[in-house]
Amino acid sequence: MDLKNRTVLVTGAGVRLGQAIAVSLGQRGMKVALHYHQSMEGAKKTLDLMGGDIKQHGCFQADLRQVSKIELLIQHIEEKLGQIDVLINNAADFFPTPLGEVSESEWDHLISLNLKAPFFLSQLVGTSMLKQGQGKIVNIADVAAERPWPQFLPYCASKAGLVSLTKGLAKALAPAVQVNAVAPGTMLPPHQISSFSQDLAIEKSLLKKMGRPDDIARAVTYFLENDFVTGTILPVDGGRMLAS
């Protein structure tokens, strides 16, 4: 796919991986819809980092845990930027949930944001892509889908579901729409992870270092520019899955 002047929706574009992906795609000439929930300042910073003509981009707020808000989000994006050609399901939450202490609200929150939202976004946008005759969907999964962490079981379950969803969507939307996923390993660490856990994750990788958000952005771009790949889960983890 030629990315120039295509419209892409990046969910969770105000921080970390989403910000890096959005900036990378904006610099490649795409019209970027920057979704955020609470990180309005982060979304504005992403817009500034993209440079160029910021009028061809836009920031859009939505709580993706609610399907009605997803529907409004898509409507607003299409009104401003046109039909969505590319969907990047990046928005997610991540925090410790030790077994025996997990509340129903924590479970519902993680599953709703990390799995339910990508499904309904993909259903809405994917059916529109089918009518257009082409499109790309890239989900941001996690190597924890295959190597679950005991202290983060609901999160790991949500990402395992996203991996399955990726493969199912690739079948359901073929041949017009390609659906793939990037599975990051240890990136720049969120504040919830201890320095000990960071060091342990690095030690378990073959490359003995953490990845950077730009590593994920480049993997996403690979999927968008390649028209003969679908249903693939690409680990970007410094070889951690092989080393485990």
PLM ranges: what are they?
Residues T7, G14-V15:
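Conserved glycine-rich cofactor-binding loop
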Residues L25, Q83, V163, L173-M187, ...:
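Conserved Rossmann-fold SDR core element
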Residues P98-L99, E106-I111, I137, A201:
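Substrate-binding pocket helix/loop in short-chain dehydrogenase/reductase
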Residues V102, A144, P148-C156, G168:
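Active-site loop-to-helix junction immediately N-terminal to the catalytic Tyr of the SDR YXXXK motif
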Residues S122, S158, T166:
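Active-site helix of classical SDR
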Residues T127, A170-P175:
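Alpha-helical segment proximal to the catalytic Tyr-Lys
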Residues Q134, R212-V236, M241:
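C-terminal substrate-recognition "lid" of short-chain dehydrogenase/reductases
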